[in-house]
Amino acid sequence: MDRFSWCTGLLDIDETLVIQQRGVRLSDGEEKTKFDSGTLLLTTHRLIWRDQKNHDFCIAFPLSQIVFTEEQAGGIGKSAKIVVHLHPATPNKEPGPYQTSRYSYVKLSFREHGQIEFQRRLAEELTQRRWERLSASASPSMQMNKGPQTGRIKAVGIVGIERKLEEKRKETDKNISEAFEDLSKLMEKAKEMVELSKSIATKIKDKQGDISEDETIRFKSYLLSMGIANPVTRETHGSGTHYHMQLAKQLATMLQAPLEERGGIMSLTEVYCLVNRARGMELLSPEDLVNACKMLESLKLPIRLRVFDSGVMVIEHQSHNEEEMVASALETVSEKGSLTSEEFAKIVGMSVLLAKERLLLAENMGHLCRDDSVEGLRFYPNLFLTQS
């Protein structure tokens, strides 16, 4: 710790910040210090530690003092550390918190993680040794300002830093303004697209103009794929039962094609994602989706909500045949000898959740039996049923 010197924490003109990390504690070798919680800054020239509560409390040492670094992994109740081995303190060193130390290394404890990236960037700086090149390029101008104008160097440094900070602030303000402008334009375009979709939907409905049947189907396909079809909302259909009835009708129309592609059954989670993706900005809450799905069967719509014994909720076609589904599962398992739900899902092309429910249903009906071991749940054909 006797290599550290007091500093202001401000960067020199030719110095650049590389990375910083909060929640770092300094240790003098194996001994704890009062530098318990601060921000560690790595620049092209120095390693700076600044107290998180009192920013004027800063210490630093030059990177040229470092011999090598090593990492110490964390454990239970212990933070990961970077051990920095240092050269002996130079005789002309500026005053610091420690005059002497019996250790030739310091430990940097990272309480809030980030040590891996910090160590990588520190190793890069030690390899590139940018402080030597930057100091060499800055030395001619420093020589010009020596002698009676010594005080001017400090003034130029502070003014330069303030100017840089002001330029960065202006650039940030400009970027924020441009971002808000882009967001406003995007929202305006989104409104235009919604209005356009409503107009097209109305024309399709009224069959105005020379729109053929094929063009009508194509328009509907485009609108659905773009996710901007005219959705049922509380603003347009009120609230309560009427809203959920209209929503159920729209769901029945929209889910026909996806259900056919997925073998006539989908988990409610899949349905929720699919519906909200298609509705665009008019997002649907989980409660409204469940309430609408509960009305599907009573409204005599072609799809229905089904709840398995495990509590898993799915949407399926009214024509979905349970016996055929179980027979298909039995045939697949018999061909392979035995299957897990993951293997079955991969073969039939459905989610693992639905695959497991299908196998459990076949088991409940006596067609399959299980082997539940440390390797997982595996299903086998019920030989007692088939061989008898």
Swiss-Prot record:
Which GO BP terms sit in this record? protein transport to vacuole involved in ubiquitin-dependent protein catabolic process via the multivesicular body sorting pathway
Q: By its UniProt entry, which SUPFAM superfamilies does this protein fall under?
A: PH domain-like (SSF50729), Winged helix' DNA-binding domain (SSF46785)
Q: What is its main location?
A: cytoplasm
User: PROSITE patterns, alphabetically?
Assistant: GLUE
Q: Which residues form a coiled coil?
A: 162-198
Q: Where in the cell is it found?
A: Cytoplasm; Endosome
Q: Which GO terms describe its molecular function?
A: mRNA 3'-UTR binding; phosphatidylinositol-3-phosphate binding; ubiquitin binding
Q: Which InterPro entries match?
A: GLUE_dom, PH-like_dom_sf, Snf8/Vps36, Vps36, WH-like_DNA-bd_sf, WH_DNA-bd_sf
Give every GLUE C-terminal domain span.
Answer: 105-138
Alphabetically sorted, this entry's keywords are: Coiled coil, Cytoplasm, Endosome, Protein transport, Transport
Pfam family, any one: EAP30
GO CC, sorted alphabetically, is: endosome; ESCRT II complex; late endosome membrane
Described by its record, this protein's role is as follows: Component of the ESCRT-II complex (endosomal sorting complex required for transport II), which is required for multivesicular body (MVB) formation and sorting of endosomal cargo proteins into MVBs. The MVB pathway mediates delivery of transmembrane proteins into the lumen of the lysosome for degradation. The ESCRT-II complex is probably involved in the recruitment of the ESCRT-III complex.
Family per record: Belongs to the VPS36 family.
Assembly description: Component of the endosomal sorting required for transport complex II (ESCRT-II), composed of SNF8, VPS25 and VPS36.
The protein depicted here goes by the name Vacuolar protein-sorting-associated protein 36
Lineage from the top down?
Eukaryota, Metazoa, Chordata, Craniata, Vertebrata
